[in-house]
């Protein structure tokens, strides 16, 4: 049975957005997924998406999905690609435009939508079975990250305002799917002149407290504009 009756009247019936919402949690890259409770996807896990409204830009639709799901207003949002395989949806032709959002886990206040049975963070390396082509979309995004993080400082949007060098290294390792040599990594990061020592230490940790750093916003913006090359 088609689920066209579930589409709001103010939305297009053949164009959707899927928002891949990522966060770092204890050194692991995680993605927010939803188990739907209606339509063809009922009882199954998938990306968080919605139909595009007739009077809405596609990027605005993607932002709306992230904002209404996480409560976060300011986050990194970028278009991944359009996915329009003729058989991606079993009943009728639907094209989706995928965006990825990078959020800080501690800033999120997860809000369950109307067509939501359950919503949960998953490690990107341990995903449940997903609806339609959503696994392919996620895999495409993870491959995209491997290039993007080496040439733009996009991943930094996942870190807290003040962070340790270990947290920064864990971020790169998670997005590149590699284990990095600690001294070599720190040497490369220092050459970028991107970090400012906060002259503070971690608090409330069982292990030896590490120094905290923050990004130099001026250098950060230049790197976003002109890019860089991080080879490992």
How should each PLM-predicted stretch be described?
Residues 47-55, 157-158:
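Short histidine-centered catalytic/ligand-binding loop motif
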Residues 200-232:
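Long, intrinsically disordered, low-complexity Ser/Thr/Pro-rich regulatory/activation regions
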Residues 1, 24-25, 31-34, 55, ...:
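Core subunits and conserved enzymes of cellular information-processing
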Residues 146-176:
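Polybasic "coupling" helices that flank or enter modular domains
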Residues 100, 110-144, 158-166, 184-193, ...:
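NUDIX/MutT-family hydrolases
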Residues 13-17, 59-63, 67-110, 115, ...:
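Active-site segment of metal-dependent pyrophosphate-handling enzymes
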Residues 7-45:
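N-terminal strand-loop-strand
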Residues 175-189, 198-201:
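Short conserved catalytic/interaction loops centered on acidic-Pro-aromatic/His motifs
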């Amino acid at each position: 049975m088609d689920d066209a009756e579930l589409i709001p009247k103010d939305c297009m019936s053949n164009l959707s957005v899927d928002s891949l919402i990522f966060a770092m949690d204890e050194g692991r890259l995680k993605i927010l997924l939803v188990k739907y409770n209606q339509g063809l996807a009922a009882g199954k896990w998938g990306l968080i998406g919605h139909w595009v409204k007739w009077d809405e830009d596609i990027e605005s639709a993607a932002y709306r999905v992230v904002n209404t799901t996480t409560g976060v207003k300011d986050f990194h949002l970028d278009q991944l690609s359009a996915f329009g395989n003729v058989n991606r949806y079993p009943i009728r032709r639907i094209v989706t435009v995928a965006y990825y959002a990078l959020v800080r886990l501690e800033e999120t206040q997860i809000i369950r939508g109307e067509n939501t049975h359950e919503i949960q963070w998953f490690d990107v390396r341990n995903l449940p079975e997903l609806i339609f082509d959503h696994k392919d979309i996620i895999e495409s995004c993870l491959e995209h990250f491997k290039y993007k993080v080496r040439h733009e400082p996009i991943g930094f949007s996942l870190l807290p305002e003040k962070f340790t060098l270990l947290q920064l290294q864990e971020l790169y390792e998670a997005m590149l799917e590699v284990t990095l040599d600690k001294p070599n990594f720190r040497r490369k990061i220092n050459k970028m002149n991107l970090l400012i020592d906060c002259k503070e230490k971690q608090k409330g940790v069982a292990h030896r407290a590490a120094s905290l750093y923050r990004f130099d916003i001026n250098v950060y913006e230049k790197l976003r504009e002109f890019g860089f090359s991080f080879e490992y």
